[in-house]
From Swiss-Prot:
InterPro entries: Cholesterol_7-desaturase, KshA-like_C, Rieske_2Fe-2S, Rieske_2Fe-2S_sf. It comes from the Eukaryota. The gene is nvd-Ci-1. Its EC number is 1.14.19.21. Pfam families: KshA_C, Rieske. Keywords: 2Fe-2S, Cholesterol metabolism, Iron, Iron-sulfur, Lipid metabolism, Membrane, Metal-binding, Oxidoreductase, Steroid metabolism, Sterol metabolism, Transmembrane, Transmembrane helix. This is Cholesterol 7-desaturase nvd 1. It comes from Ciona intestinalis. Belongs to the cholesterol 7-desaturase family. The chain crosses the membrane at residues 67-87. The keyword Protein transport does not apply.
């Protein structure tokens, strides 16, 4: 039966279409294939042999064109199916793409509005330090191939992140100590070292200069700063401490990822115009879950219209329980979250149980158990500069959650984060919020989070000549 399908398509679709197109083109060109009448109304054929040959050749050409278009369309369809089924999801929301739909300066571009909001936003003197101490993601593992170097700007620093030929990742200061050349722009990885594009000085992963092409002797001062680096859970992290202290704790390895039990399904990246503490503080703000995130994800991320969507027959219901700091690991905070979809206020569908681990100021592991299988969202937060951060969610899940289903998970999760970003992009950080007793977890969370600030942690200062700056 299946073998007959191409023949049936050819005979019942392509050939009739070719006939119609051929007649149309032939008539348009002045080659009439029908019969004409003489003065006595007697039908006389006027088709010559040349016209018959022209007609047949034209029909063959049109038939081949239709066949080529069908093959091209089928190829495009198969490509999109391949991407949907096998290619991990990758969605990036740049700064300015979310949360500025209803701004008073609606005639401006989103990029201009985003910059305008950043300049005009009320920033008080009590804003917490902008760069806490801890581990922060710079790139995902799959984004850095062996022998490749990338420039990453984060935490007020410029990093050269490179992977040696043997596969080891290292992080150096981007600027060469010799004459300030940028090691990550034009630099070349040679074996386990990074060569400066300016004069050819070569540095190993520890920052030591191991070769200078025009000097036989390498002076002891020929070295650059090497940053503590860890590659864990398919991402590369840097340790930042304002006082230059060595790492005080390590990032937990998720065994299901390292052993391959969970496979990579995709990622979502958001750029947000906010203070880094605003983002993880969401976990302790239970009241916002039952308001901001209740409308179904398909009702969209625009907060002014989501409640008017016809998708409101279904609602997201969240219940959370905060556990607090982990025993013996004060840098980790735990809480449990349950979710289900409430349809027509009667049926509970798609239940989801999450164990959430806040690890330092910039990492969150969200382990979930769903009707489709188990998995983990690895959330990372990295400040690019004061009040501008990158938020990523990488999904790793069991074989029972295929890539196409992972795409749906990530898409729905991204819409919920879009709603948060719309709030973050337009809010100010309130250092002394007016909290109710029902908001007590927020105060507890802020006390816990304060451990990642020290006396010398960088703060945002105000410059009258150009607005916000250092």
């Amino acid at each position: 039966m299946i073998s007959r399908i191409p023949r049936l398509l050819f005979e019942n679709i392509l050939v009739p279409v070719a006939d119609v197109l051929t007649k149309s083109v032939s008539n348009f060109a002045g080659h009439k294939s029908d019969q004409s009448y003489n003065s006595n109304a007697t039908r006389v054929s006027t088709i010559s042999d040349e016209e018959i040959e022209f007609y047949l050749n034209l029909k063959s050409a049109v038939l081949l064109l239709c066949l080529a278009l069908c093959i091209a369309g089928f190829s495009v369809l198969m490509y999109f199916l391949y991407v949907l089924v096998f290619v991990p999801y990758n969605r990036v929301k740049r700064l300015g793409s979310i949360g500025y739909q209803n701004h008073e300066e609606g005639h401006l571009s989103k990029k201009d509005i985003a910059n305008l909001v950043r300049r005009r936003r009320k920033v008080g003197d009590d804003l917490p330090p902008v760069f806490p101490n801890g581990w922060f993601r710079l790139v995902d593992s799959q984004q850095l191939e062996p022998g490749q170097v990338k420039q990453v700007t984060a935490l007020g620093e410029h990093f050269a992140v490179f992977r040696s030929k043997s596969g080891k990742a290292s992080i150096l200061d981007a600027y060469c100590p010799h004459m300030g050349g940028n090691l990550a722009v034009g630099g070349i990885v040679k074996n386990d070292c990074l060569e400066c594009p300016f004069h050819g000085w070569r540095f190993d992963g520890d920052g030591k200069c191991v070769a200078i092409p025009y000097s036989e002797k390498i002076p002891t001062f020929a070295k650059t700063k090497s940053w503590p680096c860890r590659e864990v859970n398919k991402a590369i992290f840097v340790w930042f401490h304002c006082d230059g202290k060595e790492p005080e704790w390590e990032i937990p390895d998720i065994s299901e990822i390292s052993t391959g039990k969970f496979t990579y399904k995709g990622r979502v990246e958001h750029h947000a115009n906010t203070h880094i503490q605003d983002v993880p503080e969401n976990g302790s703000d239970l009241a916002h879950l039952s308001h901001l995130h209740v409308p179904h994800a398909m009702s969209g991320a625009n907060l002014s219209t989501q409640y008017s969507s016809w998708w409101n027959f279904a609602e997201h219901i969240f219940k959370a329980q905060c556990i607090g700091p982990a025993d013996g690991e004060p840098h980790i905070s735990l809480f449990y979250l349950t979710h289900y979809l409430h349809v027509f206020k009667r049926f509970k569908l798609l239940s989801l149980n999450l164990n959430v681990y806040q690890i330092g100021p910039g990492i969150v592991h969200l382990h979930f158990d769903s009707p489709f299988g188990k998995g983990v969202f690895v959330q990372t937060l990295t400040p690019v500069e004061p009040l501008h951060l990158v938020l990523t969610h990488n999904l790793h899940a069991s074989w029972s959650i295929p890539v196409w289903l992972g795409r749906i998970f990530l898409y729905l999760e991204a819409i919920q984060v879009d709603r948060d970003v719309m709030i973050w992009n337009n809010k100010t950080f309130e250092p002394r919020p007016k909290l109710l007793k029902e908001d007590s977890l927020i105060a507890k969370y802020r006390r816990w989070y304060s451990q990642f600030y020290t006396e010398n942690s960088p703060r945002l200062t105000l410059k009258s000549e150009d607005g916000n700056g250092w």
